[in-house]
């Protein structure tokens, strides 16, 4: 017969296990696997709350910070940051868009370096539905739409796409996750 005390201990053990797995996933240089992506999506509520630093605070202290509503799921390096940005977005009404590239959409071969991003995107669409925006460097109308909805988490996007986004963004809209410092930088 299970008691309330036993259930409390079991819940506490599950929380400790989840925290240990998150710590492993978030460690700098961690090799992210499909199992890590599954765990992170299935246990998003137990993910740590990651702080952010506004990089222009010294010369624009009154700039508005726009919470991320568009989440880039486009490269291996940005997947875990994308999930942390998603957790933040869920606290402010959820994501409106997942931003990706044609290369990620086509990466269905498990040997492809972009397969994990494709897998994560498909899992996210089932768990946390949002519109998918496939972006190219010269898609200025799409970029304006993304920026008009709020902040954009950009880690993992190709550099040729980052430049036009950053040029059109203004202050407080661009989010980047640093696994070394374990925080978001907002530009």
Swiss-Prot record:
Annotated membrane topology: Single-pass membrane protein
Source organism (scientific name): Acidianus two-tailed virus (ATV)
Species lineage: Viruses, Viruses incertae sedis, Bicaudaviridae, Bicaudavirus
Major localization listed first in the record, in broad terms: host cell
Keyword vocabulary terms for this entry: Host membrane, Membrane, Transmembrane, Transmembrane helix, Virion
Source species, domain of life: Viruses
Protein location: Host membrane; Virion
Keyword Signal: no
Protein name (database record): Structural protein ORF187
Any one GO cellular component localisation term in the record: host cell membrane
């Amino acid at each position: 017969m299970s008691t309330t005390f036993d259930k409390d201990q079991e819940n506490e053990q599950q929380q400790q296990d989840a925290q240990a797995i998150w710590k492993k996933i978030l460690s700098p240089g961690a090799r992210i696997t499909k199992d890590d992506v599954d765990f992170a999506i299935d246990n998003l509520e137990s993910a740590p709350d990651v702080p952010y630093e506004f990089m222009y605070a010294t010369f624009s202290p009154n700039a508005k910070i726009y919470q991320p509503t568009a989440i880039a799921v486009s490269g291996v390096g940005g997947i875990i940051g994308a999930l942390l940005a998603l957790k933040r977005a869920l606290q402010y009404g959820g994501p409106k868009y997942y931003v990706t590239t044609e290369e990620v959409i086509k990466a269905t071969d498990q040997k492809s370096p972009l397969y994990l991003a494709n897998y994560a995107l498909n899992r996210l669409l089932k768990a946390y539905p949002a519109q998918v925006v496939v972006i190219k460097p010269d898609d200025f109308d799409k970029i304006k739409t993304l920026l008009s909805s709020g902040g954009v988490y950009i880690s993992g996007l190709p550099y040729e796409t980052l430049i036009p986004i950053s040029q059109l963004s203004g202050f407080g809209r661009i989010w980047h996750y640093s696994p070394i410092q374990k925080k978001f930088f907002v530009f």
